[in-house]
Amino acid sequence: MVSLEKMVSFLDRVPSHILVVIDEAYFEFGNKISDEYPDCTKLHYPNVIVLRTFSKAYGLAGLRLGYAIGPEYLIQALTKVKLTFDPNLAAQIAGSAALEDEDFLQKTLDNNSEQMIKLMNAYAELGIKAIPSVANFIALEMKDESMVEYYYENLLKK
């Protein structure tokens, strides 16, 4: 996890003519784990755009709904090159409802945290090193290629 201090230090060193795009697709998961997880939407730089999605924590992946936050001139430039089709009305309503339903989001994040602990413990019992994650996925460190092939083949069968 990158601290707010490190993020600001980085952004302060980027020349203003260089565009910085920050993908915060997993922001809600990181923010649940630590209050120190940086919310880059609160940073105001003339060359920074922050992207967020409803696909992850809100569970609305099929709607292909997200948003960008940044200086007005950058958002206007993005609008000129965006796809012709805006999200449909159902997606817009679902996104609005998702933002208002804080209880659902909290339950989702709590459930993710609980299941993450169970998975980390299960992998530890199997002798597999799982790299801790604040999101809704885990990276596994396999000892060698044969171990990768073994799990790959067995998971395909299930």
Feature-to-residue mapping (PLM):
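Active-site pre-lysine segment of PLP-dependent enzymes
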Residues: M1-V20, E24-S55
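Residues at alpha-helix caps and immediate loop-helix transition turns in enzyme cores, especially N-
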Residues: V2-K6, I33-E36, G62, A91, ...
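PLP-dependent enzyme catalytic core of the Aspartate aminotransferase-like
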Residues: E5, K157-K158
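Short histidine/acidic/glycine/proline-rich micro-motifs that form metal-
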Residues: Y26-E28, T84, A139-L140
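PLP-dependent aminotransferase class I/II
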Residues: N47-I131
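Conserved PLP-binding catalytic core of the aspartate aminotransferase-like
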Residues: E125-L155
